[in-house]
């Protein structure tokens, strides 16, 4: 009989970051690491230094992302659109 083991490194709490999946014990969203990894080309080792995390925390976040890719990709697209809107508003205010 197989026993599935869980790694308790990713949490969701409505009181932290609106219930978005975060690395346990931090307010760091899984999507924050994924964006740094995929778009800014940061390696897992670089992410450990950038965010003061263990390698197991980084790999847990990446594994969680790939297991929930569709939902988290929607969240990332939403974050990118919000960032663009904020940037456009800031630029228009400055001019």
Please report, for each region that a protein language model flagged, where it lies by residue.
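Long, charge-rich, low-complexity intrinsically disordered regions
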Residues: 2-4, 9-10, 16, 38-39, ...
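Short, Lys/Arg-enriched anionic-surface-contact patches
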Residues: 8-28
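Structural motif
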Residues: 23-25, 52-55
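Short, amphipathic alpha-helical "recognition" segments used to contact nucleic acids or chromatin
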Residues: 27-41
